[in-house]
Swiss-Prot record:
PROSITE patterns in UniProt: RIESKE (PS51296), RING_HYDROXYL_ALPHA (PS00570)
Pathway: Aromatic compound metabolism; 3-phenylpropanoate degradation
Subunit: This dioxygenase system consists of four proteins: the two subunits of the hydroxylase component (HcaE and HcaF), a ferredoxin (HcaC) and a ferredoxin reductase (HcaD).
Keywords per UniProt: 2Fe-2S, Aromatic hydrocarbons catabolism, Dioxygenase, Iron, Iron-sulfur, Metal-binding, NAD, Oxidoreductase
Protein name, UniProt field: 3-phenylpropionate/cinnamic acid dioxygenase subunit alpha
Cofactor (UniProt): Fe cation; [2Fe-2S] cluster
GO biological process terms, semicolon-separated: 3-phenylpropionate catabolic process
Positions annotated to bind Fe cation: H213, H218
GO molecular function: 2 iron, 2 sulfur cluster binding; 3-phenylpropionate dioxygenase activity; iron ion binding
Ranges of residues in domain Rieske: 44-142
InterPro entries: 3PPDioc_HcaE, HcaE, RHO_NdoB-like_C, Rieske_2Fe-2S, Rieske_2Fe-2S_sf, Ring-hydroxy_dOase_2Fe2S_BS, Ring_hydroxy_dOase_asu_C_dom, Rng_hydr_dOase-A
Source species of the chain: Shigella flexneri serotype 5b (strain 8401)
One family name in Pfam for this protein: Ring_hydroxyl_A
Amino acid sequence: MTTPSDLNIYQLIDTQNGRVTPRIYTDPDIYQLELERIFGRCWLFLAHESQIPKPGDFFNTYMGEDAVVVVRQKDGSIKAFLNQCRHRAMRVSYADCGNTRAFTCPYHGWSYGINGELIDVPLEPRAYPQGLCKSHWGLNEVPCVESYKGLIFGNWDTSAPGLHDYLGDIAWYLDGMLDRREGGTEIVGGVQKWVINCNWKFPAEQFASDQYHALFSHASAVQVLGAKDDGSDKRLGDGQTARPVWETAKDALQFGQDGHGSGFFFTEKPDANVWVDGAVSSYYRETYAEAEQRLGEVRALRLAGHNNIFPTLSWLNGTATLRVWHPRGPDQVEVWTFCITDKAASDEVKAAFENSATRAFGPAGFLEQDDSENWCEIQKLLKGHRARNSKLCLEMGLGQEKRRDDGIPGITNYIFSETAARGMYQRWADLLSSESWQEVLDKTAAYQQEVMK
């Protein structure tokens, strides 16, 4: 059995000097350890409460590569179970979502209540004349399930920090999407799913730490939507302009702490996002006063940027995109993307949000294709022996981290930096190399203290 010491994790990651060895994106032994020590120990996004509003409502998803079903209980609480019959390991729930009174295995017909209890075994008296203790054979329950402002998370590890502590300061940034208006948020439409042939850490890192790529990877989109030859702004309708936000923002920052990451621009207009639909832009202007009252000016204006909760929950504020990177091996990830909107928005505005999210970041989105192509090409190159063992530079903004005194929390840097990426890989290495969560937390504290010297 391969152990963390066999893999020499800390020789592959050097966050103090900004180095990473790309074998971390290709090694199957590392991937198996990730399934155990990251996806088996971290809080993972399961669903939004709006997707399962009534008792018996369920939603099927994954925790790493483990299929799980999330179910609203009769008392309104939420449980999650391994989607696996206890008889011969068959899946018991197949529909993406729906409402049910029971989950019945199609192999031998064992049936489970929405509370996970085994309630029926076909031909039980004849098949088990010695008796069967059904109370012992219920579905395996995810022991830790908590919600944060509508987002449901699960964790297999009962020794892990609670969700509130796990999120830490990233919750302040997350509230900029979840808490703009009274009533919170909801998921609009279904889930778009597709597969990208790359390691899960590429998209997670980009959403945590990488605004730098947008100037170059998305150059064609910027050229099409950007300023006219005379320097004036193109008009997109409803008063919206298309000048890239990095040309007009007065400042910008990146946040990187506890493995999480975020970055955004300080803008002066409540519609400063080049990628959104005109109706969405108008909606942001019309609701700005409420958002500012609830969140303050900085977060109310924050419509452009990037975010990731370690390991695999990402979102983009202005385009209302919420996405999960489900790992499917060391060289493949399955993307699930949701459109998340204010519940108080009109149906017309919600439809405009959905159109904007799909247009830019759907499976055929004009920005999504740029990103996917980058990640796939990197993964192809890393098949080479020298390529996957040649150290990469992770030095951007190294040593420039600071804590702000204006109420914006956490370890920050200028937006064009890799503070969040270094923090993400440090948390990644600490999880893989530690036997307990307390050991992880101690290592994180020591790293962050060193960063802020």
